[in-house]
A protein has these predicted regions:
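Phosphate/adenylate-binding glycine loop and adjacent helical scaffold
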Residues: 489, 493-666
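Beta-strand-enriched, solvent-exposed domains that form extended recognition/catalytic surfaces
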Residues: 46-206
């Protein structure tokens, strides 16, 4: 009897434990749901929770060492699901293109009319005109890099042989009969003869002779984070995995926008250093920048650079651009002609279609054309697209299949056997609703980066390939990419200076230190994803003092902008609210005796509603240190800053009467 009672009691106890366990699981689920669906708790608080509870574990991190705790975040985190959607592809024209540029087997280049497409029309007549930029450099014209002119339109019927014609861009116009224009399009012409003689002369005298040089092809999509690339371009991700490309999972940007991040890649310099030699705010100083493509050209490489959206391109957005073409094949005149001389269609606040073609297609078709033209000869190509991704987090989803098709075409043409191919971005989305979440903060700082090395290079350089495999899970930065380009250049017999922006950075063909932090990689704490956050009391006087000092800092900067009568162009701003403040844990610089307190603010100012993230140092007693490179605006200023054509536009809310008088002219 006692045994039966004992068993019965044990059974009841077991059931009680099961019920308690079930109740506990329900409580945990409810807490987790609340945790993720409450605005504040769903992002920074969650991050704070992880950094505290996984303090001594590498589980859940992309990079983990004593200096860097870089979280692995779910691309479909609940806090951002509402912002994610798939965009549909829409062709720019339902009709086939009437004309194409064709490279014949013997190398001859033809402008050709598609005879099948031409059958749609009874009396088709076409002519072509050469498009060119000014041939004489003139420093007094501040828009040299945005000027184009068209030559006379020359009639043709079936084709034009372009071999002996010095033309890089042309405009085709076709009519059905004598009056009605039924087709207009622009074409870029990559004629190897333009660079061939120079390349032959260089090759015969350089140390590259008898060496197999590795070509370089860089393909960029603006404003695409690593996580967003996985969300929007799964077919491309699958292609990269299938073909054996290497993804740098710990690639962290070093600056705010496109310009500093690409300058770090192309010159190895930070903004402060590059401004000493080539301040882009001054006319044509970019011509004196030590872009690494010049070093590749000097050692015998053909060079090319192209970027769509001429008004916001890297070297022309509130900048004068280049007085002289910086590369052998400089496609800005082609993009200008496409945007100015053809009908355009807007999408994502960009010129999505120019004539019958997608703007992004023009860039990557040019990349294919250039790299294919120089298969077997060393080349350096830099091709960048803004049109589908600069203003839209979801825009790349419409291009996924087409992008894979471009990559396969390059592979079929032999480009992948010749070239180190890098597919990358500069940063994630810098504006929009997603930036109010922690995941948005995180994604902005971690752009995607994939790299391909030909089989022959892997065989000849097993240590370089092994190092690259190691580096895919370590902290890397744009300065490491510059050092990698410098490494490729040196292997071809060329030289370039080491990175001044990050003297400790090294080529990706060498293993980076396992114990590496953002300071080692040339990344400031403001942009660093190796950091952690802790709660901080908003009511602490230190917080309000810091916010007030930031407002004063902003107003002092904008005070310099005045009308001819001495009136302020920008409104005096004040603090609207402290949205968030956290204590920033910089694991690269944590010392028990350090009295410096790092605070990470999200502030909203008024008028205008500008939202700013600031990483601010506080040193007792009462010293708040604000650095310009530690401030970022996370919502668009748009026409709010229309009274300024350059300078600190992100801080300027134009005074209403001044802004209205300017807008009347648009």
């Amino acid at each position: 009897m006692w045994i039966v009672w004992k068993l019965s009691k044990g059974l009841r106890l077991s059931r009680m434990l099961q019920s308690f366990t079930l109740l506990l699981m329900l409580c945990v689920f409810a807490f987790t749901y609340f945790y993720y669906t409450t605005d504040e708790r769903s992002d920074y608080q969650h991050y704070q929770y992880l950094t505290r509870n996984l303090h001594n574990s590498s589980v859940g991190y992309l990079v983990w060492n004593s200096k860097c705790h870089m979280l692995s975040v779910n691309p479909y985190d609940p806090s951002i699901r509402q912002f994610v959607k798939k965009e549909t592809f829409e062709p720019c024209s339902t009709k086939p293109k009437l004309t194409t540029i064709n490279r014949q087997a013997n190398g001859s280049i033809h402008l050709t009319v598609d005879q099948d497409a031409a059958k749609r029309y009874v009396k088709l007549s076409c002519c072509w005109a050469a498009i060119s930029r000014p041939t004489t450099a003139n420093e007094f014209f501040l828009d040299m890099d945005s000027r184009i002119s068209a030559g006379p339109c020359q009639d043709f019927k079936d084709r034009v042989v372009l071999d002996k014609k010095d033309v890089q861009v042309l405009l085709v116009t076709c009519r059905d009969g004598k009056a009605k224009v039924i087709y207009k399009n622009t074409h870029s012409v990559i004629n190897p003869k333009r660079a061939r003689q120079r390349l032959l002369n260089k090759s015969s005298s350089s140390s590259m002779k008898n060496k197999k040089a590795l070509s370089v092809l860089m393909l960029g999509l603006d404003s695409v984070s690593r996580l967003n690339f996985h969300r929007t371009m799964p077919a491309a991700c699958a292609y990269f995995a299938e073909r054996g490309w290497i993804e740098l999972r710990g690639y962290n940007k070093m600056g705010d926008n496109t310009f500093p991040n690409l300058m770090a890649i192309l010159t190895g310099q930070n903004e402060t250093t590059s401004n000493l030699r080539c301040d882009a705010k001054l006319p044509y100083t970019l011509d004196h920048c030590p872009m690494i493509w010049y070093n590749f050209r000097d050692v015998g490489y053909a060079t090319a650079y192209a970027e769509d959206q001429a008004g916001i391109s890297t070297f022309n957005n509130v900048k004068a651009g280049f007085m002289k073409p910086p590369t052998d094949y400089y496609l800005r005149p082609y993009i200008l002609a496409s945007e100015k001389l053809l009908p355009t269609r807007q999408r994502f606040n960009c010129k999505h279609c120019t004539g019958p073609e997608l703007s992004v297609d023009r860039i990557f078709n040019a990349a294919l054309d250039f790299s294919e033209a120089f298969v077997g000869r060393p080349s350096f190509g830099f091709f960048w697209s803004n049109s589908i991704s600069h203003e839209s987090m979801n825009g790349p989803s419409l291009y996924d299949a087409r992008f894979v098709a471009k990559l396969r075409a390059m592979d079929d043409a032999g480009v992948m056997n010749d070239s180190m191919v890098v597919v990358l971005s500069d940063h994630g989305m810098r504006y929009g609703d997603i930036r109010d979440t922690f995941v948005g903060w995180y994604e902005e700082r971690l752009p995607f980066f994939y790299i391909w090395l030909p089989e022959w290079f892997r065989r000849r350089n097993p240590d370089a390939y092994a190092a690259l495999l190691v580096n895919q899970d370590r902290l890397t930065s744009p300065y490491d990419v510059y050092e990698t380009l410098r490494d490729v250049l040196q292997r071809a017999g060329g030289q370039a200076p080491i990175s001044t922006g990050c003297p400790l950075c090294s080529s990706l063909f060498k293993p980076t230190s396992m114990e590496r932090g953002c300071r080692d990689a040339g990344i400031s704490p403001h942009w660093c994803t190796c950091v952690g956050f802790e709660s901080y009391n908003k009511s602490d006087p230190i917080v309000s003092e810091g916010a007030s000092q930031f407002v004063e800092y902003v107003n002092n900067l904008t005070e310099r902008y005045k009308t001819s009568l001495g009136l302020r162009l920008c409104s005096i701003l004040s603090l609207k609210r402290i949205i968030r403040v956290k204590k920033l844990l910089d694991y690269d610089n944590l010392r028990p005796t350090d009295k410096v307190l790092k605070l990470f603010y999200l502030l909203e100012l008024t008028p205008g509603g500008g939202k700013f993230e600031i990483t601010m140092d506080y040193r007792p007693p009462g010293i708040h240190i604000i650095r310009e490179e530690q401030v970022s605006r996370i919502n668009l200023y748009g026409h709010d800053a229309i009274c300024l054509d350059k300078g600190y536009k992100k801080y300027c809310q134009c005074r209403i009467n001044i802004a209205h008088s300017i807008l009347k002219w648009f």
